[in-house]
Amino acid sequence: MKHIKKYENFGSGNYASYDNSTGENFWGDIAGGVLPICKKTKRILLNLRSKYVNEPLTYNLFGGKLDGDENIIDAVKREFLEECGYEKNIELIPAFIFKSPGGFQYHNFIGIIDDEFEPELDWESAGFKWLNFNELLSIKPKHPGLKLLLKDEKSLGIINQLIS
């Protein structure tokens, strides 16, 4: 089957793409997200997606698509700031890269932050949770992207190293 992407333009360079090979909708062509881990507490921050986004009311990373000429690192840091108000330094460790048959890419990063904080959420989020590793594995419902990340051996190795 030929891969066909359909685009819906939302203005200001924002568009959604549709991959007919999988039936999936993606926001842009390249996107990324971060799974933040607090260095001191070893707990992990998850985003509960709002009812206004794809895969609503599922737990996932904070993230989104590249804007303009951004690189993936700058995009992930910007999205983390926009979605939860985090203005301090975050170290990003590359993890799993999801690639759809139609060409969409989602770059997952594990983030290291010094302290837990109370996120100031935007409209894309309905809530958040700070979790230990076992709670992360058992929380439901998970976004399909989070499920894939947690099945990836490299990503799990990075997480385990940081929480040990």
Which sequence ranges carry the predicted segments?
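Acidic, metal-coordinating catalytic segment for phosphate/diphosphate chemistry
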Residues: 8-33
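Short secondary-structure boundary/capping segments
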Residues: 26, 51, 119-121
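Entry beta-strands of beta-propeller and related beta-repeat scaffolds
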Residues: 43-44
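Recognition helices and adjacent regulatory flanks at domain boundaries
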Residues: 50-52, 78-79
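Unchanged
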Residues: 59, 64-154, 163
